[in-house]
Curated annotation (Swiss-Prot):
One of its GO terms (biological process) is DNA catabolic process. Its EC number is 3.1.11.6. The keyword Ribosomal protein does not apply. Coiled coil: none annotated. Heterooligomer composed of large and small subunits. It is an enzyme of class 3 (hydrolase). This is Exodeoxyribonuclease 7 small subunit. It comes from Rhodopseudomonas palustris (strain HaA2). GO terms for cellular component: cytosol; exodeoxyribonuclease VII complex. Keywords: Cytoplasm, Exonuclease, Hydrolase, Nuclease. Disulfide bonds: none annotated. Its main location: cytoplasm. GO terms for molecular function: exodeoxyribonuclease VII activity.
Length: 83
């Protein structure tokens, strides 16, 4: 898993990237991984984190807030302001 090429991270779904990231975190937290391997899987974890953030930003950009009129009836959508 951790020895997969960095380029393939860009092809992973959010769910798959998150699953792999969680596995890496568990392995690092266990503290039983040799130093060189720890560094390699940490770097992979960083790439996976960036992929998840990218996919979340893309999903966020696609989410719209439904706007309503005075009677509460839906009349359209506008970009969701998540701040």
């Amino acid at each position: 898993m951790a020895d997969a090429a960095p380029a393939d991270v860009k092809k992973l779904s959010f769910e798959r990237a998150m699953e792999e990231l969680e596995t890496i975190v568990k392995r690092l937290e266990d503290g039983k991984v040799p130093l060189e391997e720890s560094v390699a899987i940490y770097e992979r974890g960083e790439a996976l984190k960036r992929r998840c953030e990218e996919l979340l930003r893309q999903a966020e950009a696609r989410v719209d807030k439904i706007t309503t009129d005075a009677q509460g009836q839906p009349v359209g959508t506008e970009p969701l302001d998540v701040q």
